[in-house]
Design a protein with these regions (language model features):
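C-terminal target-recognition/interaction regions appended to catalytic cores
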Residues: 1, 214-323
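A short, Lys/Arg-enriched amphipathic alpha-helix followed by its capping loop at the start of a domain
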Residues: 27-34, 52
């Protein structure tokens, strides 16, 4: 008889760290996981997050102030953490660094070491691998392996794995304590991109998104001439992107200016709206955007994840655990 108890007789409980507006949580909940704790440093995210999740509301706190004793029981740790330099020799010094220079990754390691979850998924920018000549990524891998975890890591592009019209490369690091689980785990297969950004556009958007009466209009009107392309303003010139695909949405969209991608529609030249950006990140229309400043929404969405990619990874994690 199969001695391994069915690990999914109850939903696996997850810790949602650096949670932002809950994109990772959304993907994992779609795959049947249950969130028991959510944390982020940014209080602006709380309005958006809490409006979309019934339980486990966002706890706004510096992760350094969260004590492991206060965390609920959980099985799986999720974190889309910032990419930072390591000014320290490694994990132990990072732990013992009381001056707050400690890298935020070490806060994740601290929780993993104390609570020893079944596994984790960490998400980061693709540059993590080359950051500081590869040193940063090596310390992260070494630290996680020293804590007893087996790892697989891969860069996935949202337009290849999430059926999203966005050129967004992110690295996903999966770890399991049990080696048989990591052997069974595979990253998702590539999917054909059937969604073009035209399909996610709203047919009517408020006047404020249009450039037609703005000073920049004269400088961009000749270049922005194809309804099937997404453009970016690059301080002095317009850059066009591959047909039907949007450039990476980033947090600096919230800085205003012209960081938000630009398109041509029947009414003229305009930037994408926050709702359109959330769709390009794979958020369902049932996900509610609160009535807060557009700049805050752009930043939150750009900082978030491609929900459909996360969901595919979460399904494969689940499959590895029940296989």
């Amino acid at each position: 008889a199969n001695k391994i108890p069915n690990i999914f007789s109850k939903p696996l409980r997850t810790l949602d760290l650096f949670a932002g507006i809950g994109g990772i949580r959304l993907g994992f909940e779609k795959a049947g996981f249950q969130t028991v704790f959510s944390n982020d440093f940014d209080k602006n995210c709380k309005t958006t997050y809490d409006q979309n999740f019934e339980n486990s509301k966002l706890i706004v706190e510096d992760i350094k102030n969260i004590s492991v004793e206060d965390l609920p029981e959980f099985d799986f740790l999720l974190a889309g953490f910032p990419c930072q330099s390591f000014s320290i020799a490694g994990y132990r010094e990072g732990f013992d660094d009381k001056k707050g220079r400690g890298n935020l990754f070490f806060e994740i390691a601290r929780i993993i070491e104390a609570r020893k979850p079944i596994g984790f998924m960490l998400e980061n920018v693709k540059n993590l691998m080359s950051h500081d000549n590869g040193n940063t990524f090596n310390i992260i891998k070494q630290t996680l392996q020293d804590l007893g975890y087996h790892l697989k890591a891969r860069v996935l592009n949202s337009m290849e794995y999430g059926n999203l019209p966005q050129n967004r490369e992110r690295i996903y690091i999966i770890g399991f304590k049990n080696e048989s689980y990591i052997n069974k785990f595979t990253f998702p297969e590539k999917k054909r991109l059937t969604k073009s950004f035209r399909q996610i556009l709203l047919s009517k958007v408020p006047e404020k998104y249009y450039y037609n009466n703005k000073p920049l209009y004269a400088r961009i009107k000749d270049s922005v001439n194809d309804k099937n392309k997404v453009y970016q303003w690059r301080r002095k010139y317009v850059r066009e992107n591959k047909k039907g695909v949007c450039p990476t949405l980033t947090a600096n969209m919230g800085m205003g200016g012209h960081n938000v991608p630009i398109i041509l529609d029947n009414q003229g030249i305009r930037k994408l709206t926050p709702l359109e950006c959330s769709r390009i990140q794979g958020f369902p229309d049932s996900y509610k955007l609160p009535n807060i400043a557009d700049s805050a929404l752009y930043k939150q969405i750009g900082n978030s994840v491609s929900v459909t990619v996360i969901e595919e990874i979460a399904k494969n994690i689940k499959a590895a655990l029940v296989a």
